[in-house]
């Protein structure tokens, strides 16, 4: 994430500072000395719906906790969070948003800490409610939320917090003979995104019992959602000490043992290389850093709403029932406090919906403006997020003008147009990029309007950072194309370029090593007449990479190819190329950088 141009810390730095107080003086912190009486466990009826069958919808406290918007945190940074304010948000959600599918009321960091960030732990090293923020404890809060027909969420950092360790003699609940010294490594190595916890050693039998005790407490309080934060690999950390896969596996096991369906969400900037673990053990994973700007508004376009466009594509294959790609909080409902233009607010929600991200807002639900309400309650857009359609991804090479799409179960397409530039621009979705030709009927989802049957494409002039969202239903045939393999003997390789095996590529081969002047030229690309052709490029790239593309030796245009997620996955994007009648050459050149590996191109048989 970029740092803002003004003197406000980026989210990662702000969260780091937030935890400095958390780690200060921990060598003398003894939970038994500061413990409050544990809240009596009382069984609460569990919700019956499957966990994470669709992306969850709701609200989270962190955006308002972290903002410096005037009057929002009058008693110091992160002071917004109190029982009264959470219950006000729950009441507002029940009144305004519940009927549209919003159901989770999630309490984020700080519920066990006072305004100076001093923590509260029970006699067994488990976080418990700060008596000023939550004077009745955490169970009555969940009870109130449930009484509104909603679900309650809570938050913990990964690992054993240093203050919870105490002197190492703190007993683990319901585990005779186990103390906090028996669940961590002997050298007290640290873990999580802030190194604020001791790493738990799950080769020790007492370790699972401690996680079991935490899960039991949360379940007995009646919570339906748990966010575990600072998880690695991710959270800007790597290496053995910050590998928390075993922690998440332990949490999944502990939650299952409670018998209560609890949604387990992971944060932040998770390593995509461990996606199999995140899918196996959790119901959602944050793909990026905090969306909040830690500034005088809740968010800003540059810090880091716009960054999601570069990052979401890599994860698009991974979201589905049971576990979803989390783009973070959706702060589009409060107008000035959000820090965005109306166009940016619509674009923000458009991306979240097509990416099948959870739709949870961090706005003040008691102060939603009319425009924000219209965004958050647009049933057609919500339906895209909640449908069985897979997450969308770019179907054009990326830049300021982007087209994202996903094919729906009924054969139609969800299509989003984005203008990420700073000036108005026309953006076009060609039917060829979707794989069909002729006509398609177009439905404008934001405006609830049918645009009729359009030939070959849909174009919209968008404001800066603007968007449109459509359902496109094909009425023409599949696009007829001629395929050209990158590894074909008639092509010309230059510089470092070489042919390599590729199990996910057509023909099981590709051209790679396109770096520092490496190039691939397709020879004898034949079309019947001159025109602009929407050429589909199949490629592999573990990160976003540019390529300089030229036709017949003319000046090159640089296109950026979105990440395919790893070097074992192939995807396609389309690029417009002006071809002459007859034979053409199409060259992919890495220039002075590194280009994606190329599998093949498919050229329409007509322009």
Where are the regions that the model predicts?
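Glycan-recognition surfaces
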Residues: 182-189, 201-203, 257-364
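Aromatic-lined carbohydrate-recognition surfaces of secreted/lumenal glycan-active proteins
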Residues: 150-165, 252-273
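N-terminal module-boundary/linker segments of secreted carbohydrate-active enzymes
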Residues: 40-83, 266
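Extracytoplasmic
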Residues: 425, 434-442, 452, 456-607
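Carbohydrate-binding surface patches
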Residues: 346, 352-355, 360-362, 397-436, ...
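Aromatic-lined carbohydrate-binding/catalytic grooves of carbohydrate-active enzymes
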Residues: 64-73, 89-144, 148-238
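Glycan-recognition and catalytic regions of carbohydrate-active enzymes
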Residues: 326, 356-421, 450, 499-508, ...
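Secretory targeting and sorting signals
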Residues: 2-40
